[in-house]
Amino acid sequence: MKRYPPRPPRSARTARRPRRRIPAFHPVPVGKRHDGWTPARQVAFIGMLYETRSVVAAAKAVGMGRESAYRLRKRAGAAGFAAAWDAAMGFAVAPVRLHQAKCTGLPAHYRMRAGLMQVLVHKGCFAGLLTKPDNSALLQHIAQLDRHLAAERMEAWGG
């Protein structure tokens, strides 16, 4: 009589890997250079990091160095980029409130112009990038301009 090992529990057989969702982020503000960290290159780096889970391989895939990637992550205003990095590596990510300048360190006018970058992933592979307008940053910028204009009017009236 043949003896077969016991079957694993149903939950172990059908268990899937949890899907890693990369949050949208504002690109880190850097100087304009054709060979530097452009917003598209930042998104491509996060996408390749999602695929490879290797900082060295992802940086090499986008034509940059490992050290410069870590420097970019430590820059001011890189909170969203760092959260996307952590999500791509599979770490638990605390949500970043992208609409608050105190959390991101980026002014509303920059967030409005740059927009939100979303990494597109299809079947576990980097598929491209999607740029979304940041409407909350637009509304914050308009409110700031309105307050500034109201303050100027009060000064003009001698108040």
Can you say where each PLM-predicted feature lies in the sequence?
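N-terminal, charge-rich alpha-helical recognition modules
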Residues: 1-152, 156
